Amino acid sequence: MALWRSSDNTVYLPPPSVAKVVNTDDYVTRTGIYYYAGSSRLLTVGHPYFKVPVNGGRKQEIPKVSAYQYRVFRVSLPDPNKFGLPDPSLYNPDTQRLVWACIGVEIGRGQPLGVGVSGHPLYNRLDDTENSHFSSAVSTQDSRDNVSVDYKQTQLCIIGCVPAMGEHWAKGKACKSTQQGDCPPLELVNTAIEDGDMIDTGYGAMDFRTLQETKSEVPLDICQSVCKYPDYLQMSADVYGDSMFFCLRKEQLFARHFWNRGGMVGDTIPSELYIKGTDIRERPGTHVYSPSPSGSMVSSDSQLFNKPYWLHKAQGHNNGICWHNQLFITVVDTTRSTNFTLSACTETAIPAVYSPTKFKEYTRHVEEYDLQFIFQLCTITLTADVMAYIHTMNPAILDNWNIGVTPPPSASLVDTYRYLQSAAIACQKDAPTPEKKDPYDDLKFWNVDLKEKFSTELDQFPLGRKFLLQVGARRRPTIGPRKRPASAKSSSSASKHKRKRVSK
């Protein structure tokens, strides 16, 4: 007897449809007009480890300037819709808008290569666990020492039209009450990378201020700071691709020394992991190990800077379009981390015999940058689909173009008084128009204004000449020897001579 039964195979339904994100090349039309823009020489000087107040804080303090900080340049571009164009008929302002596309960039770095060191005069170092002769028990005395290290070597460049995102581990909120001295819970935090934020130096991307209360586990410049690491996973998965058009990075690190930490051990070693010893080895020492990082040798053979880069295809959907007429350049370069040592005599005349009490020692760090760009002028036709897509992506773009979206009509009844100036009714003053707020007003960047530094004479600038060489454009000569036109007399005689030869 035949018996019918339903199939045991699992039926997979198609996933629900999602809104498709299109590439900027699908609605942005590129023109053949290119501009060069470059900054001036950008310099900064400060103390490499901490801020220094001057005269008890009455004057502006000496800033903290370290090679292990992020340099985030916010580059402001002119509005192309208000720009003096070489061809006024290039676009129709009634149906089109102009935008900039970044197609070339060169980040120049001055100063020689060098290795900088950082350290802590009271560094929490207990034993040398690499060449240890005996296992010491838990130390009850202050074993901190003056230690310096050379950090991890990093070169980094991230370019986008919004700030780059960073990640670090911070102190989280525990689900239940904990006792004083318990290990705090960890939480991964994502924040924008600002100018002056510390990079990962080899000790991890974490909030050292809240997670290391001894203030001696890491060197001075990061013991009360937050070290951030770029969140490449999130920026690569950015829906619109604004945070990272492309990135360049090189990292190098090895462990130079191996130590353990002083203090009471929070997590006891399980007894099944070792066999108890005798005498001084009856109780094992601390197992909280920590290496000292080192970035090793720096070389000009592995430099990312002082060379041009051309953007043909971005890694995301934004192929170099500078929304809101701005760019964010995030830079790290630890290969030029030399810290200057300065000395000043405390007396008017320099003594003939050296005495350390008559001299003051100082340390400073300097940085030098130069930014150059090649921009391409592009047009966007304001069709209904394009405007709806841009409004979904970022409504502020349409507001900056003076294009408003009409709100739907209100279904509720609106009260309208007749005598607006009458004292018998409440004040009918119109609400003030809210000012446009900068979305990055609370963030810190190094502002670079290029609104008056655009030029179409590409052959007059180093990066412009490199770009012309790439595209194969030949420059038309403006001066120099030219072929002299033949005189009328010689032309007439030549014609007669030619006719004479033909008559034969």
From Swiss-Prot:
Self-assembles into homopentamers. The capsid has an icosahedral symmetry and consists of 72 capsomers, with each capsomer being a pentamer of L1. Interacts with the minor capsid protein L2; this interaction is necessary for viral genome encapsidation. Interacts with protein E2; this interaction enhances E2-dependent replication and transcription activation. The gene is L1. Forms an icosahedral capsid with a T=7 symmetry and a 50 nm diameter. The capsid is composed of 72 pentamers linked to each other by disulfide bonds and associated with L2 proteins. Binds to heparan sulfate proteoglycans on cell surface of basal layer keratinocytes to provide initial virion attachment. This binding mediates a conformational change in the virus capsid that facilitates efficient infection. The virion enters the host cell via endocytosis. During virus trafficking, L1 protein dissociates from the viral DNA and the genomic DNA is released to the host nucleus. Belongs to the papillomaviridae L1 protein family. One of its GO terms (molecular function) is structural molecule activity. It comes from Human papillomavirus type 70. It is found in: Virion; Host nucleus. GO terms for biological process: endocytosis involved in viral entry into host cell; virion attachment to host cell. Keywords: Capsid protein, Disulfide bond, Host nucleus, Host-virus interaction, Late protein, T=7 icosahedral capsid protein, Viral attachment to host cell, Viral penetration into host cytoplasm, Virion, Virus endocytosis by host, Virus entry into host cell. This is Major capsid protein L1. Residues 474-504 are annotated as: Disordered. HAMAP family: PPV_L1.
